[in-house]
């Protein structure tokens, strides 16, 4: 996939995650660790504007100078920023303006990639920006789910996924591994998280890993079997958290 195609794919995927949201859903901040959906859309756009368009596109026109303060996160070298716990108090810019902001930056980025995408430093920064946005896609979904979990009617993020799949999970088996010194971390040009680089050696103790993921049906069995009340099923720190927070079920389903 070309760099231009990768850019378009990642940017459109972010928007697709928001397609079931109403305008009112975009601005809610349900706790300090949650960012409103509109902030994610703006911040990932600001990243491309700040670290690619401004240094590499001399004729680029900044969409709004105030966005630099509003949508910086923790990039202290880039300047000051609006406090994270107060992001939900920003009723302006409105949602439609942030979508225009994304269009503005996408158009400029497309031109930049076509004209300078073969420069190693530009290609590297575009890749970094795409990985950054893909990380925010996960955060975006996590934050939307938390916002909806606070509503007494428990709205679904994607109502189309409410029907259970017409299949059963294969038997879960565990494969034992002896452990040892392994080289871990990202390699190649694919997606990775920030903490997956640089690639390095580390000691891994002997372990066993399941052949598949846990299903929500199995998790329901754990709840019904008093899994949250049985200390033998938890590590000491986990059990302390269960007791301290009064957990008896997942935060949302």
Positions of predicted regions on the chain:
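Extended beta-strand/loop cores of jelly-roll/beta-sandwich
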Residues: 2, 6, 15-21, 25, ...
């Amino acid at each position: 996939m070309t760099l231009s195609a990768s850019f378009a794919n990642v940017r459109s995927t972010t928007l697709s995650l928001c397609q079931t949201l109403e305008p009112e859903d975009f601005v809610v901040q349900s706790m300090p660790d949650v960012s409103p959906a509109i902030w994610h859309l703006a911040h990932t756009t600001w990243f491309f504007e700040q670290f690619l368009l401004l240094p590499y596109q001399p004729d680029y026109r900044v969409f709004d100078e105030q966005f630099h303060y509003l949508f910086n996160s923790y990039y202290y070298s880039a300047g000051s920023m609006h406090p994270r716990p107060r992001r939900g108090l920003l009723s302006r810019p409105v949602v439609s303006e942030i979508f225009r902001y994304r269009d503005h930056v996408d158009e400029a980025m497309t031109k930049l990639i076509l004209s300078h995408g073969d420069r190693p430093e530009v290609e590297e920064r575009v890749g970094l920006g795409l990985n950054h946005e893909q990380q925010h896609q996960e955060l975006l979904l996590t934050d939307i789910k938390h916002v909806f979990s606070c509503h007494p009617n428990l709205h679904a993020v994607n109502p189309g996924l409410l029907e259970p799949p017409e299949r059963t999970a294969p038997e879960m088996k565990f494969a034992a591994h002896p452990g040892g010194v392994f080289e871990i971390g990202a390699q190649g040009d694919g997606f990775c998280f920030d903490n997956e680089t640089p690639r390095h050696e580390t000691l891994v103790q002997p372990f066993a890993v399941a052949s598949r993921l846990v299903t929500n049906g199995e998790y329901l069995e754990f709840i019904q079997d008093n899994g949250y009340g049985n200390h033998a099923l938890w590590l000491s720190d986990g059990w302390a958290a269960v007791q301290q927070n009064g957990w008896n079920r997942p935060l949302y389903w």
